[in-house]
């Protein structure tokens, strides 16, 4: 790994471990690498993320490149999105204009629609999992397929996964649900946040109270503040997305025909739809599924921490202490 890639900086951290920006010494290409500690952290979610992600080739989805092993970690190498998270853009701007929100929403729906066409539902769509490529006219890049499920490979989802603010009512029931329909709800939350600058089902006075958020999700209690100017077409679309009964919720194909969605639709999206999503620019995955599965199995064996990169160990130690603080905060919320 170290012979092939030169580490440049940390990009972020989460429950999984650390993500770093690295340079491919051969091609000079910048790529992102997600490091997951070998051993018990290499579970079904990690395997699912890698296998599902490998099969996806679409301009609005972060490209999977390969998996490697280090003495201590499983490393997932993927396309680098230089523009960062869409979430950060909203934090900076406060909220987007309706036209800006539509521009990003159109790309999000294009990427999600492609996943669904391959029978893959994401199950954790949110602004933090929506990156930008850094170009002057930013291209959305969906990432993080750790909770994704493939109808071809896995059973119907019934576990409660995802981020509280984005979870659909049926996901909270702990019964089987259609992951594609739940993804539509999460796309609606993303659209609302872009337009309003806050979450639709959080109590503004008590945003960290997850119980209150869940109660409002189940009751579909949301409103658009008076100070936010949103067209009637857009309001109608949101009201068709935020429907508690999943069988009555608008579907992705219906969203793609909606008047509001079709306005100023970028030519590349409409042309891609006609071409049935074939991303001709994308090279096919170089690693065979069999090789990936072999690497994953090997990664389930704990690594030799004595051989670890000291900088990576320091980042992981810092992450652990942050996680402990966050867990304490969440405990206080209940």
From Swiss-Prot:
Post-translational modification: Autophosphorylated in presence of Ca(2+).
Active site: 124 (proton acceptor)
Reactions performed catalytically: L-seryl-[protein] + ATP = O-phospho-L-seryl-[protein] + ADP + H(+); L-threonyl-[protein] + ATP = O-phospho-L-threonyl-[protein] + ADP + H(+)
Cell location: Cytoplasm; Nucleus
A GO-annotated cellular component: cytoplasm
Regulation: Activated by phosphorylation. Activated by hyperosmotic stress.
Stated induction or repression of this protein's expression: By abscisic acid (ABA) in leaf blades and leaf sheaths. Induced during incompatible interaction with the bacterial pathogen Xanthomonas oryzae pv. oryzicola.
Tissue-specific expression: Expressed in leaf blades, leaf sheaths and roots of plants grown hydroponically. Expressed in shoots and roots of young seedlings. Expressed in leaves and maturing seeds, but not in roots and stems of field-grown plants.
Gene3D superfamilies assigned to the protein according to its UniProt record, in alphabetical order: Phosphorylase Kinase, domain 1, Transferase(Phosphotransferase) domain 1
GO BP field: abscisic acid-activated signaling pathway
Keywords: Abscisic acid signaling pathway, ATP-binding, Cytoplasm, Kinase, Nucleotide-binding, Nucleus, Phosphoprotein, Serine/threonine-protein kinase, Transferase
Entry keyword Flavoprotein: no
Limits of the Protein kinase domain: 5-261
Sites where the protein binds ATP: 11-19, 34
UniProt-listed InterPro entries: Kinase-like_dom_sf, Prot_kinase_dom, Protein_kinase_ATP_BS, Ser/Thr_kinase_AS
Pfam families for the chain: Pkinase (PF00069)
EC number of this enzyme: 2.7.11.1
GO function terms (MF aspect): ATP binding; protein serine kinase activity; protein serine/threonine kinase activity
Membership in a protein family: Belongs to the protein kinase superfamily. Ser/Thr protein kinase family.
Function of the protein: May play a role in signal transduction of hyperosmotic response.
Descriptive protein name: Serine/threonine-protein kinase SAPK3
Protein source organism: Oryza sativa subsp. japonica (Rice)
